[in-house]
């Protein structure tokens, strides 16, 4: 059930009848795909992101980090290399707000680009660097007719409105997400189990998938059948 809040849900009291699901079509298991990702910038969340990505991609995937890393960061990446199995991690040193540097990366060769905030900088300075990077990326996209998905981390929620101009696909404001999560848990602590399930790589998630993966196209099926076929994968 999708609702604005938990107190706006009204059950109709109906418990059926339910039809017996029938298998239709040839169910197609979705395989993980080789992905080539680029991380621009760095902070303590970078290692967690690499480990999480490793759970979703196929062997042979790559992840390139371009950032100014400390010796401690480099040591962490070496440890992560030994812990992951699907991603080959490489590091390049460069300035993420310099357009020539970004052009030299051939960013069009990457399927995903993640822009991380430098948290050792002042909040506004870090977000300014991120916004400049985004503007350069979108300019490169238009100038060289390239297409790539960009996920951007920002430190100040107010700067998100400025980032819309740069047309990033998704924004993540970490502190704001934590605040929203804590407010939800304060109202209902049992939601923690739900979030734990959603945040696990093996847990339940929402994806857009072609209907042909679950049913034969052009044939009428009921909702229970779709659910049964999806659960069979």
Positions of the model-derived regions?
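Cytosolic regulatory regions of ion transport systems
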Residues: 1-233
């Amino acid at each position: 059930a999708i609702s604005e809040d938990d107190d706006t849900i009204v059950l109709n009291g109906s418990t059926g009848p339910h039809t017996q699901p029938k298998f239709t079509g040839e169910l197609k298991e979705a395989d993980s795909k080789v992905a080539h990702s680029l991380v621009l910038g760095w902070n303590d969340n970078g290692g967690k992101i690499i480990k999480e990505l490793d759970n979703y991609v196929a062997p042979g995937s790559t992840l390139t980090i371009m950032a100014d890393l400390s010796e401690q960061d480099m040591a962490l990446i070496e440890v992560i290399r030994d812990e992951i199995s699907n991603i080959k991690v490489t590091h390049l040193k460069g300035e993420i707000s310099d357009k020539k540097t970004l052009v030299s990366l051939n960013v069009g060769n990457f399927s995903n680009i993640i822009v991380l905030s430098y948290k050792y900088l002042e909040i506004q300075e870090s977000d300014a660097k991120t916004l400049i990077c985004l503007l350069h990326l979108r300019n490169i996209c238009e100038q060289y007719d390239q297409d790539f998905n960009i996920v951007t981390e920002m430190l100040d929620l107010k700067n998100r409105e400025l980032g819309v101009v740069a047309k990033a696909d998704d924004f993540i404001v970490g502190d704001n997400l934590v605040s929203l999560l804590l407010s939800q848990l304060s109202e209902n602590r049992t939601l923690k189990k739900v979030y734990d399930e959603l945040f696990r790589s093996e847990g339940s998630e929402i994806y857009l998938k072609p209907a042909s993966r679950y049913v034969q196209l052009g044939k009428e099926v009921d909702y229970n059948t779709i659910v049964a076929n999806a659960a069979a994968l």
